[in-house]
């Protein structure tokens, strides 16, 4: 909304708020009735359609409308406060008129404000659980409620601006089909997750790639099992894709342990003829030394107990034969050294890797914040909360992602696990660029 549009809207809202005070200046009853009717219709229009926007997503339209309504209520409240201070101390306006006008104004402002807050509360994808709970529980605390209000406003504004940038980028490049690669994309998840329909491991990334022309498949392998077992499942997935589509090959995008699983499928299970490229993201190619130390210090009975509980849960969630301990052991530096000894890179497969790092323990929530500290304490250096950056390098090194600011990018952020926009890092743009470069290489 432009400055002129906002100013015009605020002007007519102020006329409505002070209609009781302005009525004596309108001796003609018909003029008063028409003015009241017109301003009330305008007020209702503001509630229903608070902003005109070119945004194509209905949720974002509602969200941005909420931002504009809250902003309008704040600005007009401040103006109204200044007007009342002037009327009380500098004029002889009857108290009865001031009180009546004030009550009507307060009701109208409250309704405008609440409409805006409800829109933001229900439609923002970036607010998060804790901010919503904080508002519900602590809205009445002076000072803190203003802090929450400012946070709500900032989050909603940035979310809308970010989404509009994505929309404009797509409209500019949609004819180019930036991600329409020669071979389809096979996305391979990491450990302790599955490819669920109702919760995509890769967040908003697949939809963005598809918008730019990509063809996406998912590996659908076990959430936790040995590298060998997961690789067998990935092999079966690749062969099925090739058979069903006739594509000949696939481009693998693998995160975390999925990178090890994919490498094994290509190097040891004969999939080099069916894979054009492998891109690993935050994969522990040389293992996680802290996993080995932790397993050596924890009671085997306790590890088995946790494993049984995990396997029971994930069997219910879709795994056919999960193996908690085997999956975990293959992340140790000892096992990765063994695997690297047998996983010889296939000459016909383009291999590249990239990673990310957290700025501090505050960059992510549990358990990544704890993992970050453990890795640092044990001498692992810079890491993403699970994997040291030195362990992420394999093949053509694309480097470590380092956005501006102190937050950094965690093991979950790099796959958009929390769907949070990170200042200085466009996760969807990162993958779009990654796939586009594969397209340019002829893959």
Where do the PLM segments sit?
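Serine-dependent carboxylesterase/thioesterase catalytic core
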Residues: 2-10, 20-31, 189, 216, ...
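Solvent-exposed loop/turn segments at secondary-structure junctions
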Residues: 192-193, 223-224, 257-259, 284-286, ...
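Flexible, membrane-associating and regulatory peripheral segments of lipid-active enzymes
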Residues: 1-198
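Short aromatic-enriched loop/helix-cap "lid" or pocket-rim segments at secondary-structure transitions
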Residues: 199-200, 288-294, 362-367
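C-terminal catalytic-base region of ester-bond hydrolases, centering on the histidine
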Residues: 32, 99-106, 130-137, 345-443
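Extracellular/periplasmic catalytic domains that process cell-envelope and extracellular macromolecules
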Residues: 179-180, 270-273, 343-347
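Active-site catalytic motif of lipid deacylating hydrolases and related acyltransferases
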Residues: 177-249
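A Trp-anchored, charged/polar loop motif used as the substrate-binding/catalytic surface
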Residues: 324-342, 432-442
């Amino acid at each position: 909304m432009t400055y002129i549009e906002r100013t015009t809207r605020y002007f007519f809202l102020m006329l409505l708020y002070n209609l009781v005070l302005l009525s004596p200046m309108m001796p003609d009853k018909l003029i008063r009735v028409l003015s009241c009717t017109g301003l009330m219709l305008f007020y209702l229009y503001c509630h229903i359609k608070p902003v005109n926007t070119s945004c194509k997503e209905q949720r974002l339209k509602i969200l941005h409308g909420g931002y504009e309504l809250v902003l309008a209520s704040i600005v007009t409240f401040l103006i109204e406060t200044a007007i009342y201070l002037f009327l009380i101390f500098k004029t002889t306006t009857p108290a009865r008129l001031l009180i009546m006008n004030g009550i009507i104004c307060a009701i109208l402002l409250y309704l405008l404000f609440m409409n805006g807050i409800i829109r933001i509360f229900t439609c923002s994808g970036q607010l998060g659980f804790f901010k919503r709970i904080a508002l519900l529980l602590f809205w009445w605390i002076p000072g803190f409620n203003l802090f929450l209000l400012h946070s709500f406003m900032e989050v909603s504004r940035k979310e809308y601006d970010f989404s509009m940038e994505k929309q404009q980028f797509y409209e500019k490049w949609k004819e180019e089909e930036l991600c329409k690669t020669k071979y389809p994309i096979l996305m391979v998840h990491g450990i302790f997750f599955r490819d669920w329909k109702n919760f995509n491991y890769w967040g908003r990334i697949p939809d963005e790639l598809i918008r730019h022309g990509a063809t996406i498949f998912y590996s659908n392998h076990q959430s936790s099992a040995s590298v060998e077992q997961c690789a067998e499942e990935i092999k079966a997935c690749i062969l099925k894709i090739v058979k069903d589509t006739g594509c000949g090959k696939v481009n693998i995008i693998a995160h975390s342990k999925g990178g090890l699983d994919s490498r094994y499928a290509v190097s040891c299970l004969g999939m080099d003829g069916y894979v054009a490229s492998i891109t690993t993201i935050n994969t522990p190619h040389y293992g996680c030394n802290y996993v080995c130390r932790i397993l050596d210090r924890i009671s085997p009975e306790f590890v088995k107990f946790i494993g049984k509980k995990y396997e029971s849960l994930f069997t219910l969630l879709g795994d056919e034969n999960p193996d908690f301990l085997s999956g975990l052991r293959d992340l140790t530096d000892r096992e990765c050294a063994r695997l690297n000894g047998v996983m010889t890179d296939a000459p016909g497969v383009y291999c590249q890797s990239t990673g990310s790092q957290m700025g501090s323990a505050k960059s992510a929530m549990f358990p990544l914040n704890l993992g970050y500290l453990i890795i640092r304490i044990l001498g692992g250096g810079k890491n993403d909360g699970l994997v040291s950056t030195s362990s992420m390098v394999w093949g053509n090194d694309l480097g470590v992602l380092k956005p501006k600011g102190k937050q950094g990018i965690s093991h979950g952020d790099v796959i958009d696990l929390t769907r949070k926009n990170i200042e200085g890092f466009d996760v969807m743009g990162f993958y779009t660029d990654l796939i586009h470069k594969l397209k340019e290489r002829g893959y």
